[in-house]
Amino acid sequence: MIIRSPESEVKIVVDRDPVKTSFEEWAKPGHFSRTIAKGPDTTTWIWNLHADAHDFDSHTSDLEEISRKVFSAHFGQLSIIFLWLSGMYFHGARFSNYEAWLSDPTHIGPSAQVVWPIVGQEILNGDVGGGFRGIQITSGFFQLWRASGITNELQLYCTAIGALVFAGLMLFAGWFHYHKAAPKLSWFQDVESMLNHHLAGLLGLGSLSWAGHQVHVSLPINQFLDAGVDPKEIPLPHEFILNRDLLAQLYPSFAEGATPLFTLNWSKYAEFLTFRGGLDPTTGGLWLTDIVHHHLAIAILFLIAGHMYRTNWGIGHSLKDILEAHKGPFTGQGHKGLYEILTTSWHAQLSLNLAMLGSLTIVVAHHMYSMPPYPYLATDYGTQLSLFTHHMWIGGFLIVGAAAHAAIFMVRDYDPTTRYNDLLDRVLRHRDAIISHLNWACIFLGFHSFGLYIHNDTMSALGRPQDMFSDTAIQLQPIFAQWIQNTHALAPSATAPGAIASTSLTWGGADLVAVGGKVALLPIPLGTADFLVHHIHAFTIHVTVLILLKGVLFARSSRLIPDKANLGFRFPCDGPGRGGTCQVSAWDHVFLGLFWMYNAISVVIFHFSWKMQSDVWGSISDQGVVTHITGGNFAQSSITINGWLRDFLWAQASQVIQSYGSSLSAYGLFFLGAHFVWAFSLMFLFSGRGYWQELIESIVWAHNKLKVAPATQPRALSIVQGRAVGVTHYLLGGIATTWAFFLARIIAVG
């Protein structure tokens, strides 16, 4: 830390009324672009309108104006999020069986949607228990509401209305900070103030308020619920907050108030700030008292972190200094110049944020099942499968987005004249070594991982099981993963003596938590089958990275097209007369990367779905005998490609294929329709623009003959547009197909 004389004070400066509010202007399609605002000559106009509406770089080159538009758009995004949340809470209040579920979560399924009986649609409302007929939901909201201490539908109504108010507030803020008081560029570039406020405010106070809410509202209410008290008999939240004696009956240390805090006698609070580990056997979720403790600790860390950066007080870290001091022995100028990049290129900034958030989202997917945070979440298999799948897909998309914006930064914002011998320049200078090595790794992983499966399929077909790679023949045990599992399983007695159980039951040991005769979680064994599929994961991830990284590193130039930067972010080919230069733009790398991301995530969610049904989920008898949904067939079946096709895809598709005539029939229709959407994408991906242009021209001829030709000239989609439409339908169709397949299966058997 460097202490200096105070620099120029940070002032919050805004421009008053910079842009007039004009509904006339907004009503004109394409008002942000001179060419688009002229109106359509050809049908390409509508595509350009959509492509450029949010590409603020194309509206103006003024960084301040771009920053204001992005800032304003963020408020619009928040408004939509609040609106969506409000809708979720409103459905919980108006159409759900939340109160019934709350009184008996093990026998009643969550439902918050009842289908209107139009032309026989009442079949879709299945019996979820307790005499309620509706669609079983798998969003996890009920479990979250219970963990928050919500006990009746009125509270859900109030929250829904509150979220609507906030949605309106956000819309107003977006308008106000663009049209009435727009911040100056210096405000957007003041990273130290931004870090302090985001760390201390959003993360610090956010975590602290959640911890406070849990201590004063959630914990007491959940204690009553766990003890079987009728939700209507439980005191209301404000009674716990206002009446300390009420809390002291549940947690005696409350009688002493804040005295233990200020006298450093913190162990008094160990009643509700615990460090137990494992799961609560009543609910199958993490101990809520552990969660409170965690959020309190996080809050303190971030409140401290939010006071670390130098603003007007001449004390603390300066980010520019930190970055410029960051030099290694082989990295030349190191991070010098990175500060300027990240404060003038929002694409570079966004790219980093997307990469981090994408990785974090995938981490969330893995923690939601291994450390289920909410009561009765672990035994709701449909919700568990949905949460994992959802967070995996979202994480994959965000990471591809990171590569997309990194490439846009390279094309639009990177200035090669000022960047010399810093880290980025050095990476670009040895990009050939990076990409060729990565390519070799992909080839190695691909041939070896699939080679192991092909070997097994061949031996299986020839009737030689003793020569297969399996737990019962030639073993390929994941010894490093097992070592990590074992280390964590032993932690409570060794490195974490204060904990009663390890962080997750999945690590190992003898613990099993079951709620209402259903397994919540148990130690997950890893064997040869997992070793094989993990190498498929490694392969697909490396190929995705290869495609995306090649797109970023070769975004400005390559041996094939040295002047690529002049062609822009997306272009079909390097003009006529240069064959073999198609699919080289940075955009095309994102396009191709999306398919491999889809491959990678598909294998992950298939692995998860089958592994959990085979080795974790199931029922437990009074004698303690566990019967898994697919009877532990993963270890022996998933070691051949035929096993994946026969015992996973085909065997588990029976529920969605046979869903007609049952309350799951909607999933059967979605399964069919999504397959169609997926197949429709191939029409765009496997045909050239010229084919369609020829077809269109003969159709236009027919229109002219009949004198019904439109004024706007029809045009075939451009090559890039066709690919965009193709990949969108491919992903949408594929994801919706998987969704229908998973849910019909798990709701039927789980």
From Swiss-Prot:
It comes from Piper cenocladum. It is an enzyme of class 1 (oxidoreductase). PsaA and PsaB bind P700, the primary electron donor of photosystem I (PSI), as well as the electron acceptors A0, A1 and FX. PSI is a plastocyanin-ferredoxin oxidoreductase, converting photonic excitation into a charge separation, which transfers an electron from the donor P700 chlorophyll pair to the spectroscopically characterized acceptors A0, A1, FX, FA and FB in turn. Oxidized P700 is reduced on the lumenal side of the thylakoid membrane by plastocyanin. Signal peptide: none annotated. This is Photosystem I P700 chlorophyll a apoprotein A1. Keywords: 4Fe-4S, Chlorophyll, Chloroplast, Chromophore, Electron transport, Iron, Iron-sulfur, Magnesium, Membrane, Metal-binding, Oxidoreductase, Photosynthesis, Photosystem I, Plastid, Thylakoid, Transmembrane, Transmembrane helix, Transport. NCBIfam families: psaA. It is found in: Plastid, Chloroplast thylakoid membrane. Chlorophyll a' binds at residue 675. The lineage of its organism: Eukaryota, Viridiplantae, Streptophyta, Embryophyta, Tracheophyta. One of its GO terms (biological process) is photosynthesis. Its EC number is 1.97.1.12.
